[in-house]
Curated annotation (Swiss-Prot):
Species the sequence originates in: Morus indica (Mulberry)
Native organism taxonomy: Eukaryota, Viridiplantae, Streptophyta, Embryophyta, Tracheophyta
Main location per the UniProt record: plastid
Function: F(1)F(0) ATP synthase produces ATP from ADP in the presence of a proton or sodium gradient. F-type ATPases consist of two structural domains, F(1) containing the extramembraneous catalytic core and F(0) containing the membrane proton channel, linked together by a central stalk and a peripheral stalk. During catalysis, ATP synthesis in the catalytic domain of F(1) is coupled via a rotary mechanism of the central stalk subunits to proton translocation.
Membrane topology: Single-pass membrane protein
Protein's name in the database: ATP synthase subunit b, chloroplastic
Encoding gene per record: atpF
Amino acid sequence: MKNVTDPFLSLSYWPSAGSFGFNTDILATNPINLSVVLGVLIFFGKGVLSDLLDNRKQRILKTIRNSEELREGALEQLEKARSRLRKVEKEADQFRVNGYSEIEREKLNLINSTSKTLEQLENYKNETIHFEQQRAINEVRQRVFQQALEGALGTLNSCLNNELHLRTISTNIGMFGTMKEITD
């Protein structure tokens, strides 16, 4: 088996290429062969290269068109979103205004209701005061009447004897009899 390092060691034994310079031997440099190969490559590779470039150009143009379409779609969506936003803002403002007017209306209703309730309470208070005054007046009248009656009975009992008592009863019976005859 050969040693792997043998080819590298053999490099040290190669002779040097000499000095650097231009080789003017046309057959040694082979420019004719190179120009023929380049000409064939250009002639036959021109179509392939132009097809590759055309395909690349078409893909780039298609990508640009797609990007433009996407941009226009995004702009349309943005405009729709802005339109919806304006609409929602208008509705929100309208709800806000309606809410404030509803609050004011409820406030006025509450004030009116409260004032009516206060008025009713004032009327109830006045009626209660009037009722209590009438009751107090009636109590005073009853006491005065009772005291007057007691005083009159006391006076009558002290001044009245049997004879006067019988005469008063007879007079009253006579008056009732006269009244009965008048009504018949």
